[in-house]
Amino acid sequence: MVGSFVFEAELRHQLGKGASRRLRHAGKVPAVLYGGGGEPVSLLLDHHKVVKNLENEATYSHVLTIRFDGREENAILKAVQRHPAKPVVMHLDFQRVSAADKIRVHVPLHFINQESSVGVKKGGVVSHGMVDVEVDCLPKDLPEYIEVDLAQVDIGGIIHLSDLKLPAGVEIHALAQGVGHDLPVASVHAPRTAEGGEGGAG
C-alpha cells in the first residue's frame, strides 16, 4: 500500500516552543506521526511543499506516504494547525494506517446537479448542511469524495446522511450512532420574499 501523495520529512531533534518558533522562521513545519502501534515520531517538513500539498483537496482524504530517515510510512492527515492571522501552517498531525485496519476520515462532499434540480428550477434555493462527512473504511476503500446528487430534490426536500450513495466498504460514522444522528446534508427551500417570509413555488 503506497500513498498517492508523498510528504518528504526529516526527523526533528529540537523540541519545545522556542525550537518550534525558530524552525518555522527557517521555513519548516513541525509535525508528529503517531498511532498504528508505533512510537510517536517528531518530524519536520518544508513549509512551501506542505502548502502546495494542502492546496489539493484530495490530500485530506487519501492515504499519504511519509518519507523520512530512509524509510516510508503510510498515514492519513488528522489535523492541520494554521496561524490565525497569517497564511502559515503551524503544525501537522499524521496518523499511521495499516491495510488491515479501518480508519476514520472526513471526506469532502461534492454537490452535483444543483442548478438543474427540480426545486431550483421552480425558484428554490439550495442550502448545504455540511461540506464533509466522517466515514469508516479500510484504507483501500477510502473515497476521494462523496457525491450528493440534488437533481430530484424538490422545494421542501431534504437529503439526509442515510440518502447518500456510498462506495462499497464505506460506512458513515454518525449513522452507526443511531437514527437520531441521520443529519440533513442538503435541502431546497422556497426563496425568501422581500417581507422576510418564504414565497411559494412558482
Swiss-Prot record:
GO terms for biological process: translation. Coiled coil: none annotated. SUPFAM superfamilies: Ribosomal protein L25-like (SSF50715). Keywords: Ribonucleoprotein, Ribosomal protein, RNA-binding, rRNA-binding. One of its GO terms (cellular component) is cytosolic large ribosomal subunit. One of its GO terms (molecular function) is structural constituent of ribosome. Pfam families: Ribosomal_L25p, Ribosomal_TL5_C. This is one of the proteins that binds to the 5S RNA in the ribosome where it forms part of the central protuberance. Part of the 50S ribosomal subunit; part of the 5S rRNA/L5/L18/L25 subcomplex. Contacts the 5S rRNA. Binds to the 5S rRNA independently of L5 and L18. Belongs to the bacterial ribosomal protein bL25 family. CTC subfamily. This is Large ribosomal subunit protein bL25. It comes from Methylococcus capsulatus (strain ATCC 33009 / NCIMB 11132 / Bath).
